[in-house]
Amino acid sequence: MRLKTSIECARWLAFQACAFRGHDESLNSKNRGNFIELIKFTSTFNDKVTSVVLKNTPGNAKYTSPTIQKEILHILASNVRNTIREEIGNAKFCILVDEAWDELKREQVAIILRIIDKEGFIKERFFHIVHVRDNIALALKNEICVVFSHYNLHIENIRGQ
Protein backbone atom coordinates (compact mmCIF):
# COMPACT_ATOMS: atom_id res chain seq x y z
CA MET A 1 0.00 0.00 0.00
CA ARG A 2 2.89 2.39 0.79
CA LEU A 3 4.60 1.79 -2.54
CA LYS A 4 1.33 1.97 -4.49
CA THR A 5 0.53 5.32 -2.86
CA SER A 6 3.98 6.67 -3.70
CA ILE A 7 3.73 5.46 -7.31
CA GLU A 8 0.27 6.94 -7.85
CA CYS A 9 1.24 10.28 -6.29
CA ALA A 10 4.41 10.43 -8.41
CA ARG A 11 2.42 9.53 -11.50
CA TRP A 12 -0.14 12.26 -10.86
CA LEU A 13 2.53 14.91 -10.25
CA ALA A 14 4.49 13.85 -13.33
CA PHE A 15 1.51 13.91 -15.67
CA GLN A 16 0.45 17.30 -14.29
CA ALA A 17 4.04 18.59 -14.77
CA CYS A 18 4.25 19.62 -11.11
CA ALA A 19 7.41 19.92 -9.05
CA PHE A 20 7.93 17.12 -6.53
CA ARG A 21 10.23 18.61 -3.94
CA GLY A 22 9.88 21.59 -1.67
CA HIS A 23 12.42 23.98 -0.23
CA ASP A 24 11.97 22.59 3.28
CA GLU A 25 10.89 18.97 3.64
CA SER A 26 11.64 18.73 7.35
CA LEU A 27 9.00 17.33 9.69
CA ASN A 28 8.33 20.81 11.09
CA SER A 29 7.74 22.41 7.69
CA LYS A 30 4.25 23.67 6.86
CA ASN A 31 4.72 22.65 3.22
CA ARG A 32 7.01 19.67 2.67
CA GLY A 33 6.75 19.72 -1.13
CA ASN A 34 4.07 18.47 -3.50
CA PHE A 35 4.99 14.78 -3.27
CA ILE A 36 4.80 14.51 0.53
CA GLU A 37 1.80 16.84 0.72
CA LEU A 38 -0.07 14.80 -1.91
CA ILE A 39 0.61 11.60 0.03
CA LYS A 40 -0.73 13.29 3.17
CA PHE A 41 -3.78 14.51 1.23
CA THR A 42 -4.41 11.03 -0.22
CA SER A 43 -4.29 9.52 3.25
CA THR A 44 -7.20 11.72 4.40
CA PHE A 45 -9.54 9.81 2.08
CA ASN A 46 -8.48 6.28 2.91
CA ASP A 47 -7.96 4.84 6.38
CA LYS A 48 -5.84 2.00 4.97
CA VAL A 49 -3.46 4.52 3.43
CA THR A 50 -3.42 6.58 6.63
CA SER A 51 -2.40 3.53 8.62
CA VAL A 52 0.63 2.73 6.45
CA VAL A 53 2.10 6.03 5.23
CA LEU A 54 4.43 8.69 6.61
CA LYS A 55 4.39 8.69 10.44
CA ASN A 56 3.04 5.13 10.63
CA THR A 57 5.87 3.47 8.72
CA PRO A 58 9.28 2.18 9.68
CA GLY A 59 11.99 4.70 8.84
CA ASN A 60 13.49 2.56 6.09
CA ALA A 61 10.22 1.73 4.30
CA LYS A 62 8.46 5.04 3.71
CA TYR A 63 8.97 5.02 -0.09
CA THR A 64 9.08 8.82 -0.08
CA SER A 65 12.80 9.58 -0.37
CA PRO A 66 14.13 11.60 -3.31
CA THR A 67 15.86 8.43 -4.54
CA ILE A 68 12.57 6.51 -4.61
CA GLN A 69 10.88 9.47 -6.34
CA LYS A 70 13.57 9.46 -9.04
CA GLU A 71 13.32 5.70 -9.52
CA ILE A 72 9.55 5.92 -9.95
CA LEU A 73 9.97 8.78 -12.44
CA HIS A 74 12.59 6.79 -14.35
CA ILE A 75 10.18 3.85 -14.70
CA LEU A 76 7.34 6.15 -15.79
CA ALA A 77 9.63 7.85 -18.33
CA SER A 78 10.68 4.49 -19.76
CA ASN A 79 7.04 3.49 -20.15
CA VAL A 80 6.25 6.76 -21.93
CA ARG A 81 9.25 6.38 -24.28
CA ASN A 82 8.25 2.80 -25.09
CA THR A 83 4.71 3.99 -25.88
CA ILE A 84 6.09 6.72 -28.15
CA ARG A 85 8.32 4.13 -29.84
CA GLU A 86 5.30 1.90 -30.47
CA GLU A 87 3.36 4.89 -31.80
CA ILE A 88 6.11 5.63 -34.32
CA GLY A 89 6.51 2.06 -35.48
CA ASN A 90 8.53 2.11 -38.71
CA ALA A 91 7.14 5.47 -39.84
CA LYS A 92 9.21 8.47 -40.83
CA PHE A 93 9.74 11.22 -38.24
CA CYS A 94 11.52 14.52 -37.64
CA ILE A 95 13.74 15.40 -34.73
CA LEU A 96 14.10 18.63 -32.82
CA VAL A 97 17.14 19.02 -30.60
CA ASP A 98 17.67 21.78 -28.08
CA GLU A 99 20.58 22.41 -25.74
CA ALA A 100 20.43 23.82 -22.22
CA TRP A 101 22.42 23.79 -19.00
CA ASP A 102 21.12 21.92 -15.96
CA GLU A 103 21.39 23.14 -12.37
CA LEU A 104 24.87 21.63 -12.06
CA LYS A 105 26.06 23.57 -15.13
CA ARG A 106 26.24 20.43 -17.26
CA GLU A 107 25.16 20.72 -20.85
CA GLN A 108 22.17 18.63 -21.77
CA VAL A 109 20.31 18.02 -24.99
CA ALA A 110 16.56 17.50 -25.23
CA ILE A 111 15.37 15.26 -28.06
CA ILE A 112 11.85 15.83 -29.35
CA LEU A 113 10.29 13.69 -32.06
CA ARG A 114 7.74 15.06 -34.50
CA ILE A 115 5.47 12.42 -35.98
CA ILE A 116 2.22 12.14 -37.88
CA ASP A 117 -0.29 10.02 -35.98
CA LYS A 118 -2.75 7.53 -37.49
CA GLU A 119 -5.37 10.27 -37.89
CA GLY A 120 -2.94 12.46 -39.85
CA PHE A 121 -2.25 14.98 -37.08
CA ILE A 122 1.26 16.25 -36.39
CA LYS A 123 2.40 15.41 -32.85
CA GLU A 124 5.53 16.46 -31.03
CA ARG A 125 6.70 14.09 -28.33
CA PHE A 126 9.39 14.92 -25.80
CA PHE A 127 11.53 11.80 -25.95
CA HIS A 128 14.77 12.04 -24.02
CA ILE A 129 17.35 14.21 -22.28
CA VAL A 130 21.03 13.41 -22.75
CA HIS A 131 23.95 14.98 -20.91
CA VAL A 132 26.68 15.80 -23.40
CA ARG A 133 30.36 16.54 -22.89
CA ASP A 134 30.78 18.50 -26.08
CA ASN A 135 28.39 20.44 -28.28
CA ILE A 136 30.15 20.00 -31.60
CA ALA A 137 28.00 18.48 -34.32
CA LEU A 138 29.71 15.08 -34.39
CA ALA A 139 29.41 14.61 -30.61
CA LEU A 140 25.73 15.57 -30.66
CA LYS A 141 25.07 13.23 -33.59
CA ASN A 142 26.77 10.38 -31.73
CA GLU A 143 24.69 10.97 -28.59
CA ILE A 144 21.48 11.06 -30.62
CA CYS A 145 22.51 7.85 -32.40
CA VAL A 146 23.05 6.13 -29.04
CA VAL A 147 19.54 7.09 -27.90
CA PHE A 148 17.98 6.03 -31.20
CA SER A 149 19.87 2.75 -31.18
CA HIS A 150 18.71 2.01 -27.63
CA TYR A 151 15.07 2.45 -28.68
CA ASN A 152 15.52 0.82 -32.09
CA LEU A 153 14.70 4.02 -33.96
CA HIS A 154 16.34 4.03 -37.37
CA ILE A 155 18.21 7.13 -38.49
CA GLU A 156 17.14 6.34 -42.04
CA ASN A 157 13.58 7.23 -41.00
CA ILE A 158 14.46 10.82 -40.07
CA ARG A 159 12.92 13.23 -42.56
CA GLY A 160 13.83 16.57 -41.06
CA GLN A 161 15.67 18.26 -38.26
Residue ranges and their predicted role:
Residues M1-N152, G160:
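Extended, charged coiled-coil/helical-stalk scaffolds used for oligomerization and assembly
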